[in-house]
Design a protein with these regions (language model features):
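N-terminal pre-domain/capping segments
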Residues: 1-101
Length: 101
C-alpha cells in the first residue's frame, strides 16, 4: 500500500509548495480535488484539458518530485435538485473523467 496526501488540505498553498510539503512527508502519491463541492485550487480539469502546455506543466510538477497521482476526487451531485448546480457538477464530473483517461 502506498500512502498519499489529499492536496485539498493544502489548498492555501500554490501547487508547487503543496507538492513540496507532500514530498517532505515522504509519501509517494497525491490525490487532487477536481470540483463539485471541493476545491479546484491545484487541479482544474477544464483548464488542464483545454491547455496542453498547462497539463504538461501540471504533470511535471507532480512527476518531477517523484510523486504519482493516485486519485482525482470529484465531490459533487450531478443529480442536484437545482438544475444549474446539477449542470455545473455534470460538466465538472465529465471533465474529471476525461482528465483521468
Amino acid at each position: 500500500m502506498k500512502l498519499g496526501v489529499f492536496t485539498a488540505t493544502l489548498q492555501n498553498l500554490p501547487l508547487g509548495e503543496a507538492l513540496d510539503v507532500v514530498q517532505a512527508l515522504g509519501v509517494e502519491s497525491v490525490d487532487f480535488s477536481t470540483g463539485g463541492c471541493g476545491t479546484k485550487a491545484h487541479c482544474d480539469p477544464e483548464a488542464l484539458l483545454t491547455d496542453p502546455a498547462r497539463l504538461d506543466r501540471f504533470r511535471e510538477e507532480v512527476l518531477g518530485r517523484g510523486l504519482e497521482i493516485s486519485a482525482l476526487c470529484f465531490y459533487g451531485n450531478p443529480l442536484h435538485p437545482d438544475r444549474d448546480v446539477a449542470l455545473v457538477h455534470r460538466r465538472e464530473l465529465r471533465n474529471t473523467i476525461l482528465l483521468a483517461e
